[in-house]
């Protein structure tokens, strides 16, 4: 035991002596600052040979390197020229300011504020300068705000149907939180839950509509392939087909290359159809993938079938009949079902009246007709939309739906 203590004491004394010698050499190096490249090189050689490099403080090593570099510059005649960083900072600030201003102007401010700014600047000498700058900025950001092409859908007839096929209505369906709900977790990654009734919805309405699935995100094709394996949807559009307006990616139906009177869109986000709200049927967002009791899509099937099968001239008129006082369509399927039930009750009452009711109706100068139904929305040709429809009755209309039906059934 005593022997171990003695050996440890000897090792400690040797280490202390080594540190003392190292410190002496470092002090000597500091006292004699290198005045030439040779002296600086000798110091570095001495540090590597006699003084362990790891015990030399970093500040002292940096001072030795600076002294050696200064001596080398003095020996070769090179002069260190200091340049000011102020111009570079000013240029960077101007660039960052212009980019930030463009983003705020095109993606944050609404049209009302923009118009007021234009009027104010137009009344001053800065009006012409503003017009030139605004035009350049608009040309720069246009690829990021406008749809990637003017015609989002090909001309009718599309390649999937015969050339003599008459045009059919267009049903635009939002993907996120309307047909599917997507969520991400660290354990499972991305998972997509189909809304209940989406299969029946697509397979039924593809007989009546040219279905377009419109997503606000990229990569919608992979989701739609799993969602719609029978390819009932004829077109898939992604974010590049949207128009960025008022901070939202808007689905501009005017770029569909179809008659807007025969277009209807289902979406859970009012900002997505802000350019054509009269064509929209709002739906409740599907945000709980575990909810298997949702029946909104299934409830809308009867109305959408009747809307297409009755050859309505303008869908917007019919949808407008279901708007509330604030101009928003709510619970359309419920309201439509109530009107259908009301007309059925009226039909039953007429049957009960018998022959007397028939005679009174013939003698009347103003035959009774149901009021408050979809038929009161301004179109008189064709049967009432609220009647019990017979599927695929009109041979003049169902040529195209049958062609489309063969694709997905």
UniProtKB/Swiss-Prot annotation:
CC annotations in GO: mitochondrial inner membrane
GO biological process: protein transport
Mitochondrial matrix side, ranges: 64-89
PROSITE patterns: FCP1
Feature: transit peptide: 1-63
Stretches in topological domain Mitochondrial intermembrane: 110-409
Residues annotated as transmembrane: 90-109
Subunit structure: Component of the TIM23 complex, at least composed of TIM23, TIM17 and TIM50. Interacts with preproteins in transit.
Protein name: Mitochondrial import inner membrane translocase subunit TIM50
Organism listed in the record: Phytophthora infestans
Taxonomic classification: Eukaryota, Sar, Stramenopiles, Oomycota, Peronosporales
């Amino acid at each position: 035991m005593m022997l171990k203590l003695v050996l440890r004491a000897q090792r400690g004394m040797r280490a202390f002596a080594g540190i003392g010698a190292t410190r002496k050499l470092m002090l000597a190096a500091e006292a004699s600052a290198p005045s030439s490249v040779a002296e600086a090189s000798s110091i570095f050689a001495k540090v590597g040979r006699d003084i362990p490099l790891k015990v030399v403080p970093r500040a002292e090593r940096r001072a030795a390197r600076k002294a050696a570099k200064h001596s080398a510059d003095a020996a070769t005649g090179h002069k260190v020229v200091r340049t000011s960083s102020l111009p570079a900072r000013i240029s960077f600030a101007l660039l960052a300011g212009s980019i930030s201003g463009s983003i705020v102007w095109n993606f944050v401010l609404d049209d009302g504020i923009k118009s007021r700014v234009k009027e104010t600047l137009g009344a001053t000498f800065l009006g012409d300068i503003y017009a030139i700058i605004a035009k350049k900025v608009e040309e720069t950001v246009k690829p990021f705000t406008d749809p990637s092409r003017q015609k989002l859908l090909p001309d009718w007839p599309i390649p999937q149907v015969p050339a003599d096929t008459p045009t059919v209505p267009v049903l635009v369906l939002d993907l996120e939180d309307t047909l599917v709900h997507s969520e991400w977790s660290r354990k499972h990654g991305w998972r997509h839950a189909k809304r209940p009734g989406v299969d029946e919805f697509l397979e039924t309405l593809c007989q009546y509509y040219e279905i377009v699935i419109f997503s606000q995100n990229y990569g919608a094709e992979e989701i739609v392939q799993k969602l719609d394996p029978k390819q009932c949807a004829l077109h898939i559009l992604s974010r590049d087909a949207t128009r960025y307006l008022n901070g939202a990616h808007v689905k501009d139906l005017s770029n569909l290359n179809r008659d807007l009177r025969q277009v209807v869109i289902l979406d859970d986000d009012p900002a997505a159809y802000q350019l054509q709200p009269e064509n929209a049927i709002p739906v409740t967002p599907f945000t709980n993938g575990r909810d298997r009791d949702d029946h909104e899509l299934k409830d809308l099937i009867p109305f959408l079938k009747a809307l297409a099968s009755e050859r309505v001239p303008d869908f917007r008129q019919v949808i407008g009949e279901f708007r509330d006082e604030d101009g928003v369509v709510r619970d359309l399927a419920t309201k439509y079902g109530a009107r259908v039930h009301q007309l059925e009750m009226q039909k039953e009452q007429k049957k009960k009246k018998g022959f007397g009711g028939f005679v009174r109706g013939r003698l009347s100068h103003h035959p009774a007709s149901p009021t408050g139904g979809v038929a009161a929305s301004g179109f008189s040709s064709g049967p009432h939309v609220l009647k019990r429809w017979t599927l695929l009755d009109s041979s003049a209309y169902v040529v195209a739906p049958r062609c489309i039906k063969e694709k997905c059934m």
